[in-house]
């Protein structure tokens, strides 16, 4: 366990020695050297991590901890296709999805890249057919809208990417279809999406590895009925449905031509699947060339993660800074603040990536962890967050580390807007670090001591700033892969399995009999609270038919 490692104990002592030091003092001593020492560039991303409560010794000890915890060895095992997902006895080889055609990735001794490349060829052909108008609905009309039906990784990842790259929808000379994403089993979401669409011009992508996911299949069957209710004959449905799945029999039974099924594999976790055929929605929305560039960006970050020394390794540095705050400062949350509306869904994507991966209490050896694991991850796009929760980040009783992310060139620009956006991003990070003292306020002429007390900012609040020149598919791919590997690094240090998600299973199991009871079956055995909730819901449902 990590707490037995020499570097962990050294970091505890080091934390006690520096925890009251002010970052502003370190910057005053030699800020330019500090920025040079605590900044990195890789795969089109620039990371400034100088506004953290760290010294060179801190980083030396954190990187020593990464080494002692086995980060390099576990990284190499992942790239080698070993079964690092121990509880499911699987590889976690999502990096192979973005590999070049000649790469030698194997699972259980079998090369996987040829199968991946075959799916990519089919994705290119299909997406180009839809975007060019060669693939039509049953009436011969062009597809103008695509609905992606999936949940979790089959929704959050591709939805985030499509939103981030929406400015590229016309870059290949074709007008991409409008993308809609439906995930929730709440029928309101699907109903509201469908009421705006023409079934003759709409294509459905049903994303489910097993083709049995409750929410996804409920929505898929309702979408199927929508076509039938609107005059599309059952034998014509195949022109309006494609599947992303591994279950050929279930896909065929649903009425989708297996020729229009795009496969992926059980060694790809849902939250890492946007690089696979789950990314078909991305290829349809912005063109396959953009999707290929996304893969190339992820591949560039993979190569950096695999080869860079720990002290110059961006995922390792970010991961270990997260360990520093979660386990030594005992900070329970972290904030993602992208200063780009295009990246507004990135915080939600990170919530699944980090909390589903590392929200664990059991180590690889089956023993309970003795440290905190994943923080609560949250955030929204700037500058909106400044007018919502940044008050708490600046002056609240709880310190929240922030990651600021900003493209220097906007995807779309109105005169003067982007300079204001960047100014606010940089100012927030500076204000969190510097703070504002009572002496500064008095020197500025303020004399009301009560007001001064309320206007003091303690400062010394940490942040990272990640910059990119512009938000290209390549850079977005690198950004996503950066946080994937950061999450992996932290899981290795905590000695947990970042690739399973047993925590979502129990609720699914309990929901099945409750659904039957809500539909009139005899009440089962529940605690008093759950039984009362079921009874109340049954009464209302009965009155409303």
Curated annotation (Swiss-Prot):
Keywords per UniProt: Cytoplasm, Gluconeogenesis, Glycolysis, Isomerase
Q: Which GO terms describe its molecular function?
A: carbohydrate derivative binding; glucose-6-phosphate isomerase activity; monosaccharide binding
Extract the SUPFAM superfamilies matched here. SIS domain
Location of the active site: 356 (proton donor), 387, 508
List the catalysed reactions.
alpha-D-glucose 6-phosphate = beta-D-fructose 6-phosphate
Q: Does the keyword Cytoplasm apply?
A: yes
What HAMAP family does the entry give?
A: G6P_isomerase
Highest taxon of the source? Bacteria
Query: Which InterPro entries does the UniProt record give?
Result: G6P_Isomerase, G6P_Isomerase_C, Phosphoglucose_isomerase_CS, SIS_dom_sf, SIS_PGI_1, SIS_PGI_2
What is the annotated role of this protein in its UniProt record?
Catalyzes the reversible isomerization of glucose-6-phosphate to fructose-6-phosphate.
Main location per UniProt?
A: cytoplasm
Spell out the protein name for this chain: Glucose-6-phosphate isomerase 1
What Pfam families does UniProt report for this protein, alphabetically?
Answer: PGI
- Keyword Oxidoreductase, does the record have it? no
Q: Which NCBIfam families match?
A: PRK00179.1
């Amino acid at each position: 366990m990590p707490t037995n490692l020499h570097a962990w104990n050294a970091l505890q002592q080091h934390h006690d020695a520096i925890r009251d030091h002010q970052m502003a003092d370190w910057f005053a001593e030699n800020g330019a050297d500090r920025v040079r020492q605590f900044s990195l560039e890789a795969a089109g991303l620039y990371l400034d991590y100088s506004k953290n409560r760290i010294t060179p010794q801190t980083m030396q000890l954190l990187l020593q901890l990464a080494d002692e915890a086995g980060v390099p060895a576990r990284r190499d095992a992942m790239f080698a296709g070993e079964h690092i997902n121990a509880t499911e006895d699987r590889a976690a080889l999502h990096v192979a999805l973005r590999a070049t055609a000649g790469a030698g990735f194997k699972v259980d001794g079998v090369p996987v890249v040829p199968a991946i490349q075959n799916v990519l060829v089919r994705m290119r052909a299909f997406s180009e057919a839809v975007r060019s108008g060669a693939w039509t609905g049953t009436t011969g009309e062009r597809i103008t809208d695509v609905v992606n039906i999936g949940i979790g990784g089959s929704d959050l990842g591709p939805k985030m990417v499509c939103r981030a790259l929406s400015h590229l929808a016309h870059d290949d000379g074709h007008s991409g279809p409008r993308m809609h994403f439906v995930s929730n089993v709440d029928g309101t979401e699907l109903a509201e999406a469908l009421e705006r669409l023409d079934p003759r011009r709409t294509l459905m992508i049903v994303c489910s590895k097993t083709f049995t996911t409750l929410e996804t299949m409920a929505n898929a069957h309702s979408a199927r009925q929508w076509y039938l209710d609107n005059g599309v004959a059952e034998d014509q449905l195949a022109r309006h449905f494609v599947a992303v799945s591994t279950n050929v029999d279930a896909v065929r039974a649903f009425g989708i031509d297996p020729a229009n099924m795009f496969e992926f594999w059980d060694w790809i976790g849902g939250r890492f699947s946007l690089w696979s055929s789950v990314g078909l929605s991305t290829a349809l929305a912005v063109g396959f060339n953009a999707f290929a560039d996304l893969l190339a960006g992820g591949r560039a970050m993979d190569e950096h993660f695999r080869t860079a020394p720990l002290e110059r390794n961006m995922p390792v540095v970010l991961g270990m800074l997260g360990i520093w705050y979660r386990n030594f400062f005992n900070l329970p949350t972290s904030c993602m603040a992208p200063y780009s509306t295009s990246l507004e869904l990135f915080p939600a994507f990170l919530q699944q990536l980090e909390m589903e991966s590392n929200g664990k209490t059991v180590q690889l050896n089956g023993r309970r962890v003795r440290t905190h694991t994943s923080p609560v991850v949250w955030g929204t796009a700037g500058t909106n967050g400044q007018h919502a929760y940044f008050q708490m980040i600046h002056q609240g009783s709880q310190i929240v580390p922030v990651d600021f992310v900003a493209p220097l060139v906007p995807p779309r620009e109105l005169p003067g807007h982007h300079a204001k956006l960047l100014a606010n991003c940089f100012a927030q990070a500076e204000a969190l670090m510097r703070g504002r003292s009572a002496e500064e306020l008095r020197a500025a002429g303020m004399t009301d001591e009560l007001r001064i007390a309320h206007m003091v900012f303690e400062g010394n609040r940490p942040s990272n700033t990640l910059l990119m020149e512009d938000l290209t598919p390549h850079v977005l791919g690198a950004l996503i892969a950066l946080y994937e590997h950061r999450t992996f690094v932290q899981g290795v240090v905590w000695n947990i399995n970042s690739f399973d998600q047993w925590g979502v299973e129990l609720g699914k199991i309990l929901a099945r009999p409750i659904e039957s009871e809500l539909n009139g079956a005899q009440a089962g055995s529940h605690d008093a609270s759950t039984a009362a909730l079921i009874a109340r819901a049954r009464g209302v449902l009965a009155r409303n038919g």
